[in-house]
Amino acid sequence: MRGFWLRQNDNQKLMKVRDTMDAVKDAPTIDFAKMDGLVPGIVQDAKTGEMLMLGFLNETSYRKTIETGFVTFWSRTRQKLWMKGETSGNRLRVLSASTDCDQDTLLFLVDVEGDGLVCHEGTVSCFTRPVPFGSAQGKAVL
């Protein structure tokens, strides 16, 4: 296996890292066709288990995520690649990733760099607004 050694700055452990070509080649095939070239990417904090956010990836952002080790989305609003936290410093370093059974959704377990505020509204998670669900009679209220 080709590769190189990378010394991580945060804990000075040596880890084996494959080169970019091998990493992209070995990555699972994701079904980008179902949603017009995009797949949802769920981001979960590896330390706390908290769901932090959901974004969308296209083939280019998926490759970029694999190449850099940081979650990179496709911004549907700005129509461009978007490495989450590149400006704020709260980058999402991928510790592991998996796909669902249909291979059309990704789950990233991440270590959040910076102050840990992932949401653009200044919160740790984008999931902060409760949805009233249920009533005294046990029926869903939507």
Describe the residue ranges of each PLM region.
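Short Gly/Ser/Thr- and charged-rich N-terminal loops/segments
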Residues: R2-Q8, Q137
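C-terminal binding/interaction regions
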Residues: D19-L38, A46-K47, M51-L52, L57-L142
